[in-house]
Curated annotation (Swiss-Prot):
Gene3D superfamilies: Arginyl tRNA synthetase N-terminal domain (3.30.1360.70), HUPs (3.40.50.620), Isoleucyl-tRNA Synthetase, Domain 1 (1.10.730.10). This is Arginine--tRNA ligase. The lineage of its organism: Archaea, Thermoproteota, Thermoprotei, Sulfolobales, Sulfolobaceae. The gene is argS. A motif ('HIGH' region) lies at residues 116-126. Keywords: Aminoacyl-tRNA synthetase, ATP-binding, Cytoplasm, Ligase, Nucleotide-binding, Protein biosynthesis. It holds the Pfam family DALR_1. GO terms for cellular component: cytoplasm. SMART domains: DALR_1 (SM00836).
Length: 623
């Protein structure tokens, strides 16, 4: 059911007959007037004709069934909706799943998101990725697509090797019971990395010129300060690692040996230790994300790609390409594309893509080469029509390199259907984050802080603490999703839990208000008893908004813009709360007016229930 579409179709038919212009062309150019007194649906005439005679036409039919008046204002033809007929269209058979229309030709879509390095807890940067990825998957499912969510486990790189070295130097201890496991892993990684960097900087000082010396001393001071803070918190781990690392003459060689032994599966102990550490960290990730109701269908290990020889096959294929070249002493794939290919791959014409280095001088492959193999795997394993990678905007060029490489290696269809869903950074005021230095605000810390603020506000209002985690989830989700993905998010914990405006809890509160009005009603809703003359002011605005919901929701899903859906729901909540503060519903003595208002409440309740569910926010019956 799409009521506003029915309105537009009728209006387009009327105008098509009067102007002798194709009905579909008229329909596609409809707009909504900026001011409600102008009308409800508008056609800018110059978008459909350049004919001066038609541009100056002034007489139109009086209307139809859903359009009760047609009026011209300058170059615009405006239609005014017949409120009573629209009301009947919506509520005569009002479905419980009112909202997103199911797509006629569903696709199989893979959404890969979060994919954080398994070396420390998830932090605020991962938070935006995880929520966006989860909501994209939910939106696509709501539209009728078959969706598979995947997490790419980066277990074969230098960072995991540093973590592994630290863990081995500590004597392979068991995790403490009183600390979250990924937090403990992050401590080992950060301390090991800081100590390695300090030792390296000290060695470099003797061969540095004056300017380099000043810069390195400054960096060394910062590292030593951080090391001191870590030692205060974790003296046993720090002292043990400091002692063991000081005994190693060539620590880089140790790290490289771990990397090579793991990539080649040539040392069973290294393989077992890394898998153990990585899986421990993933358990911590899952525990954190479970609070936000985020789950994955599959976890894909980078090492499995290497061990299965998929990456070797890609290198072999690339080496036979006519685009292969030498680049700075390495083997690389030249990414020269014609303008048509760039357009198809969404790569700007003026951007020069650097060659894709396939193999390092030491024979190991880069992550971009592995990404080619992984992209093919994602399409293959799920028989996917489309793969969406949720990755920060800083990775835009590597993602373009990936698409270009696939295209030039003969996988043109896959390259064109590999989508980079880019997003901006999350800013926490006064905080510079660095996972390798152990300087970050973890997702768990954010959840706990939001939980504390929400708990205090619920207690102030005498609310239900049983819903606390659902309110925490909604506050965090809304704060992330209400901002367009390509813009940065400034995360202020105190502002995101506001029961009175512009927040997830505010929408939940509005839903609870609408639900409880209906729950207290003892009358059966009967459209034959409605007083249509009372569809005025905010009630009319709500009716028009209810009519528009399927169009707005479907467009938001198809364009992957959850912020549009949330913005629409917030607008409805604002109108509804303003109206409810001035007009009673259940206490209205006039049966016709009371029945009308109950139907309006029912419409708002359904929109909020279905809209919130789509974005992973639980509609609450009590707050």
């Amino acid at each position: 059911m799409n009521p506003i579409k029915e309105v537009k179709l009728e209006f387009a038919k009327i105008l098509s007959e009067r102007l002798s212009i194709d009905q579909n062309k008229i329909y596609e150019n409809f707009e909504y007037p900026p001011k409600e007194q102008m009308g409800d649906v508008s056609l800018p005439l110059p978008t459909v004709t350049k004919n001066k005679e038609l541009l100056n036409i002034s007489d139109f039919p009086s209307g139809g069934k859903l359009i009760r008046e047609i009026k011209k204002a300058g170059i615009y033809i405006n239609g005014v909706i017949n409120e009573s007929e629209l009301f009947k269209l919506i509520f005569t058979n009002f479905p419980e799943d009112y909202g997103i229309e199911k797509i006629q030709k569903p696709q199989r879509v893979v959404v890969e998101h979060t994919s954080a390095n398994p070396i420390h807890p998830l932090h605020v940067g991962h938070l935006r990725n995880a929520i966006l990825g989860d909501v994209i998957a939910r939106m696509l499912k709501a539209r009728g697509h078959e969706v598979n969510t995947r997490f790419y486990v980066n277990d074969a790189g230098r960072q995991v090797a540093i973590l592994t070295l630290g863990y081995l130097l500590l004597g392979e201890p068991n995790p403490p019971r009183d600390e979250k496991i990924d937090q403990w892993i992050g401590v080992i990684y950060a301390i090991t990395n800081i100590l390695i960097e300090i030792n390296q900087l000290k060695k470099e000082l003797s061969s540095s010129n004056e300017e380099e010396y000043r810069q390195k001393i400054s960096k060394l001071d910062e590292l030593i300060s951080l090391a001191g803070k870590h030692r205060e918190k974790y003296p046993e781990i720090f002292d043990k690692l400091a002692d063991e690392i000081s005994k190693i003459e060539n620590i880089e060689e140790k790290i490289q040996n771990i990397i090579k032994n793991y990539e080649r599966h040539s040392d069973e102990k290294i393989v077992n230790v890394i898998r153990k550490l990585v899986n421990w960290t993933l358990e911590g990730f899952k525990d954190s994300l479970k609070i936000l109701d985020i789950h994955f269908d599959n976890f894909d290990y980078e090492s499995d790609l290497l061990w299965s020889k998929r990456v070797d096959e890609i290198v072999k294929l690339a080496l036979s390409s006519k685009n292969i070249k030498e680049h700075k002493g390495t083997i690389a794939l030249s990414l020269d594309l014609d303008p048509e290919a760039r357009k198809r791959l969404n790569i700007p014409l003026g951007l020069e893509l650097p060659p894709l280095v396939l193999v390092r001088s030491d024979g190991t492959t880069l992550y971009t080469t592995r990404d080619i193999a992984y992209s093919l795997y994602k399409f293959e394993v799920f028989y996917a029509n489309k793969v969406i990678n949720v990755i920060a905007e800083q990775q835009s060029v590597p993602q373009m390199q990936l698409r270009a490489s696939l295209y030039l290696l003969g996988f043109k269809d896959i390259a064109e259907n590999l989508i980079h869903y880019s997003y901006g950074m999350v800013n926490l005021q006064g905080m510079r984050m660095s996972g390798r230095l152990g300087r970050y605000i973890s997702l768990d810390e954010i959840i706990n802080e939001v939980k504390e603020v929400a708990e205090n506000k619920i207690k102030e209002k005498g609310g239900d603490l049983n819903n606390l985690l659902d309110i925490v989830n909604s506050a965090i989700r809304y704060a992330i999703l209400s901002v367009s993905a390509n813009k940065p998010v400034s995360f202020n914990i105190k502002n995101i839990v506001d029961f009175d405006q512009n927040s997830g809890p505010y929408l939940q509160y509005t839903y609870a208000r609408a639900y409880n009005i209906l729950a207290k009603n003892e009358e059966k809703l009967d459209i034959n008893k409605v007083d249509f003359s009372d569809i005025v002011d905010d009630k009319r605005r709500l009716l028009i908004s209810i009519a528009k919901f399927p169009e707005v929701a479907t467009k938001a899903v198809d364009e992957l813009r959850p912020e549009d859906l949330l913005g629409f729901m917030r607008s409805i909540a604002d109108i509804f709360n303003r109206w409810y503060n001035f007009e009673r519903v259940l206490q209205e003595p006039n049966e016709g007016k009371r029945m009308l208002r109950l139907f309006i409440v029912k419409g708002v309740e359904r929109i909020l229930y279905n809209g919130l569910s789509i974005v992973g926010i639980k509609p609450l019956k009590r707050m």
